[in-house]
Regions:
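Long, well-ordered core segments of solenoidal/helical folds
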Residues: 47, 52, 89-112, 144-162, ...
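Low-complexity, Ser/Thr/Pro/Gly-enriched N-terminal "stalk/linker" regions
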Residues: 27-152, 246-269
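N-terminal signal peptide
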Residues: 2, 6-30
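Loop/turn-rich, solvent-exposed surfaces of beta-rich toroidal or solenoidal domains
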Residues: 385-417, 421
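Terminal, non-catalytic domain-edge segments
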Residues: 25-100, 230, 234, 299, ...
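Extended ligand-binding clefts on enzyme/binding-domain cores
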Residues: 236-369, 382
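Solvent-exposed loop and edge beta-strand segments that line ligand/cofactor-binding
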Residues: 57, 103-124, 155-176, 208-221, ...
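Well-ordered alpha-helical scaffold segments within catalytic/enzyme domains
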Residues: 65-85, 125-139, 178-191, 225-240, ...
Length: 482
């Protein structure tokens, strides 16, 4: 598997080609392989003079011979010696860069900018970032800065609902559901319980009026399950769940039922994600795949009391483990199960490791943790991605997954590794200096997205690391806490 070679060109999302069919890398499709090109081999940041010019700014090509990742030269973890908290140097660098990133976002993406309103790629992301800054720092200026973004986002909710009815989207990231959650949170923080309740009703309606076309995290039912957790975690306690538990359990049960149908059709266990059962894209990762669906189902305690659902989830995770490469990575999709390429939150080892650790926490199954640990070794080796700092398919997401692994396992090695990645980023102008780094523009689907843009993803990560610390950092939009 390590010898498989690929080449890449930038294309829009959702494109399918033949015979080389698009992979959900959000920006890549297979083309004929270049000689001696191996996407599993990383390139040393200390030898940039040897890197072809098209591989760095301003072109930032992802085509061969450009590598997928930078070589990780950080030393291995030594218990009791390696740092697992922010050093003074890292803290100073974050304190310097966070205001620069915020200033750039304000100037290039003001509330009046003609973006969509979603959390994934639009104005809602900026509203959420300022609300997070307010929550983490207690500084009222951030709440004031959030308000224009919240207002601009709220003005787009009704039009987004129309789009969602046409597409069947109900996920927190890609639909009006996330926008309504953020608007409810802003109203809650402003002390307007009635207004917050109106937006909560928007979310509740998705549970009662049908849960859409998809089951994946980004656009479907798994993301809707997350929305219920987000409201309960972040809004003022109301004495009862904001989304009634029978509605949450009902949605989770329907996802299990659809997953069972997909398993029968595909001939293997699997919780269905994005496309219908006859589609050939059975994805494995967090965005549109099995990992993202299982991750959210495991957060529904009522489901774990159902023997049928419990058995199905365990069979699904057992099957996922069976798909792991010798490298520790996982395929992007079932029907291209020999492609050991992507090592990022949405596809590959990082996101799948998180789901396996959640399964280990729920079931105590040692094989799930062992598989996750092999996957995290792959992240350590190949997780300094050329694409940038974004959450979805960049270094940021891989830092978050290592912090998550540290929280679930208690193994400080993963927190050290997250901070080692951070140290590499902050000490390398090519990765973090705004005049040198790879900007998000080359990505065609969401140049300034909360998940697909280096600037906004970094603002979220820098905020938590500075003001909450690595042990308490929470990947908003995936973990429930703001």
């Amino acid at each position: 598997m390590m010898g498989v070679m690929f080449s890449w060109i930038l294309v829009a999302m959702h494109t399918h080609t033949s015979p080389s069919r698009a992979r959900m890398d959000d920006d890549c499709v297979d083309v004929p392989a270049a000689p001696d090109y191996d996407p599993t081999v990383c390139f040393s940041l200390s030898n940039l003079s040897a890197l072809p010019k098209q591989c760095i700014a301003p072109t930032w090509s992802l085509d061969p011979p450009c590598p997928k990742c930078w070589t990780n030269d950080a030393p291995e973890y030594v218990p009791g010696t390696s740092p697992t908290t922010l050093t003074n140097e890292l803290k100073a660098a974050l304190q310097s860069q966070l205001p620069e990133y915020l200033d750039l976002m304000q100037r290039q993406r003001p509330p009046s900018h003609a973006d969509d309103g979603t959390i994934f790629s639009g104005i809602g992301a900026r509203a959420l970032l300022y609300l997070k800054l307010h929550e983490a720092t207690g500084d009222p200026k951030f709440l004031a800065q959030a308000n224009p973004y919240v207002d601009a986002m709220a003005a787009k909710i009704e039009s987004q609902k129309l789009d969602d009815r046409a597409t069947g989207a109900t996920g927190f990231q890609w639909s009006h559901i996330g926008m309504s959650c953020v608007a409810a949170l802003a109203a809650d923080r402003a002390g307007d319980a009635a207004k917050a309740g109106q937006y909560v009703q928007d979310v509740r309606a998705a549970f009662t009026n049908g849960d859409g076309t998809y089951d994946d995290f980004d656009s479907g039912g798994a993301g809707l399950l997350y929305a219920a957790r987000f409201l309960d975690e972040n809004l003022a306690p109301s004495g009862k769940p904001y989304i009634p538990r029978p509605l949450v359990y009902g949605l989770a049960s329907r996802i299990i039922s659809r997953g069972s149908a997909t398993a029968t059709a595909a001939g293997h266990p699997g919780v269905m994600q994005w496309h219908g059962p006859n589609d050939d894209g059975l994805w494995l990762g967090q965005s549109h795949g099995v990992a993202g669906v299982v991750q959210q189902l495991l957060e529904v305690p009522e489901l774990l009391e159902n023997a049928t659902a419990l058995g199905f989830l365990r069979r699904t995770l057992d099957w996922v483990v069976s798909q792991q490469f010798a490298s520790g990575n996982f395929p992007t999709e079932y029907y291209n199960a020999t492609e050991d390429v992507l090592v990022q939150w949405d596809h590959g080892a990082p996101g799948v490791a998180a789901a396996l650790l959640a399964g280990w926490r729920a079931f105590g199954q040692a094989s799930y943790r062992a598989s996750a640990e092999r996957a995290l070794e792959c992240v350590w080796e190949r997780g300094l991605l050329l694409k940038g700092l974004m959450n979805c398919h960049g270094i940021g997401g891989n830092i978050w997954m290592q912090l998550y692994a540290a929280k679930l396992t208690g193994d400080l090695k993963y927190r050290y590794r997250a901070l080692a990645f951070l140290g590499t980023v902050l000490s390398t102008g090519l990765l973090s200096n705004l005049t040198q780094m790879r900007q998000p523009q080359p990505l065609p689907n969401a140049p300034w997205g909360f998940w697909t843009g280096s600037i906004e993803s970094s603002i979220e990560l820098w905020t938590d690391l500075l003001y909450r610390g690595p042990a308490n950092a929470s990947m908003t939009g995936w973990e429930a806490r703001l």
